[in-house]
Amino acid sequence: MKESFYIEGMTCTACSSGIERSLGRKSFVKKIEVSLLNKSANIEFNENETNLDEIFKLIEKLGYSPKKTLAEEKKEFFSPNVKLALAVIFTLFVVYLSMGAMLSPSLLPESLLTINNHSNFLNACLQLIGTLIVMHLGRDFYIQGFKALWHRQPNMSSLIAIGTSAALISSLWQLYFVYTSQWSYGHYYFESVCVILMFVMVGKRIENVSKDKALDAMQALMKNAPKTALKMHNNQQIEVLVDSIVVGDILKVLPGSAIAVDGEIIEGEGELDESMLSGEALPVYKKVGDKVFSGTFNSHTSFLMKATQDNKNSTLSQIVEMIHNAQSSKAEISRLADKVSSVFVPSVIAIAILAFVVWLIIAPKPDFWWNFGIALEVFVSVLVISCPCALGLATPMSILVANQKASSLGLFFKDAKSLEKARLVNTIVFDKTGTLTNGKPVVKSVHSNIELLELLSLAGSIEKSSEHVIAKGIVEYAKEHNAPLKEMSEVKVKTGFGISAKTDYQGAKEVIKVGNSEFFNPINALEIQENGILVFVGRVISEKEDELLGAFVLEDLPKKGVKEHIAQIKKLGINTFLLSGDNRENVKKCALELGIDGYISNAKPQDKLNKIKELKEKGQIVMMVGDGLNDAPSLAMSDVAVVMAKGSDVSVQAADIVSFNNDIKSVYSAIKLSQATIKNIKENLFWAFCYNSVFIPLACGVLYKANIMLSPAIAGLAMSLSSVSVVLNSQRLRNFKIKDH
């Protein structure tokens, strides 16, 4: 069984990886992925051995709060921004008390002046009050940090909580000695505690704002979903909940309202904003017979539509599910960071303790409390400067921003692995009809042995009973030439060959057939030299003989810009193949015209499947690009499956990437975005590893002899800047652009 739920209380990747590690050890858990950014988890488990309630109890034992739905955040007395502003004000107050006299004695009243650069008792008490206020404002770090430590799952909050608590306890201890007059002054760390918490809070605020902006993509889509719709019942409009709509319901769509579910216009017309699907801002004109999709907006006039999908299976619901899965899943490249994070925090605590002991022993002055002060500063600096957040954010933040960018391009990735793997593709296999071509064959020429209008009337009358795209092309041509369409009887369809029906022909009831050459008994074929899709029209004379009445030559024209986009793809060093069930001449012509490297014609679904198998066995990483309707086996066999879709035609289950642009440019865009994303992730990881590799030893005091020591306050600033730099670098993906040539 697969379930998705939310987890509150996670602060860094050590939290998410700890939950994964703990639950992953259970025999009944098949797979679990926890997303720090989404505060969510996807789990697959054996329902015969456990249930979701038991899994929730296991997570609660680790110190986190699992929830089936993400409840609204509790309203606090202070908003995050006000809380941060207060933290900054009180931090400056404590720093002013601590260091004001060092800068200029006139800054402080005489009663608060320091003794030998050390705060007096009253000064220290005021610092303590300011520090306790700042600690209260940052209390979440202590609650979550010590809770995680108690459950043996230490995280970033644990490091901050331990470090600042140690500094506070040391300061209180020394304040006690001053109060009892055993010491004339003490060396306090109140300003260090405040500055550390302030910098961390600033960093977290910037981080959370950036996360929220990146998560806005799904929130914006959800806002497109109307809660109610106007249902027609006995010629009356009834407002109903969208969840109650079933296939076949007739709905009225008013100007300025959103489409509730996928459907088809049956009366009226409209102009729809489909930018949430395609990324194109221009409205799309829709008339009777056209499909409309959930989440799109009707700009002008009202119309009636028939629902073809319910809310659960609508286009918008599928897109939201894809975005959620993509944001919650993990890329393979993140596994390294997860492994490091699992041992990172315990290792940092061990290093901090070791550094404290070493400095206590080797400190150059014989005074114990001076040595203790140096050792404590090193201990706090090591804990505070280490940044598991930079490691944890390196991959998911880039994936999050990349998915947001993809949706603006009309692209949707199934999961992070799809986004990651697209850049590795070295062979692309294209379906032809509807993928490279318009998918709407048009009549190119007509060859007739009878009067032309009679031929058009016969063919159009029979083909109007078929839903095949070729049939629609012939019917459209007949209508354009004002051919009368007759009533048919005994209509029979032979899939893959053609259609037959009984109708009036030359004063008698005759069986007329329309289809490919294999549909007819041996006849004297017309000499047709043109390339194209051949459709014959004939009269049945006997069971063994048909009379040829004429033939249509149709062509399915390539989509605009396809040739240029394929040239772009080939410049990336990618091999291209065309697989089609069409005849050899048409497929060859299409391949040559578009500059495709190889082709296979007359290909049945099994032939396409075998070709992809063959390419993969040769070590190729294969992307299959199709329409998702009849390419499911080939799409499933490929390494990366791309479905070129228009609304509800999409088969999400078969796709790794869905393009609602229905444009080959999307394939190039997906590959380039994948490359840019992985490059961005590597930059983030490089910075995160380098930062921790360089700054942790510095905090330990390895350059003490060169007079370089990092104070706890500077360590806090460095840690905040580290995670913020990863977030800001990830945001650069927002500026990702595709060059046309």
UniProtKB/Swiss-Prot annotation:
Keywords: ATP-binding, Cell membrane, Copper, Copper transport, Ion transport, Magnesium, Membrane, Metal-binding, Nucleotide-binding, Phosphoprotein, Translocase, Transmembrane, Transmembrane helix, Transport. Its EC number is 7.2.2.9. Cu cation binds at C12, C15. The gene is copA. The active site is at D431 (4-aspartylphosphate intermediate). It comes from the Bacteria. It comes from Helicobacter pylori. GO terms for molecular function: ATP binding; ATP hydrolysis activity; copper ion binding; P-type divalent copper transporter activity. Its main location: membrane. GO terms for cellular component: plasma membrane. This is Copper-transporting ATPase. It is found in: Cell membrane.
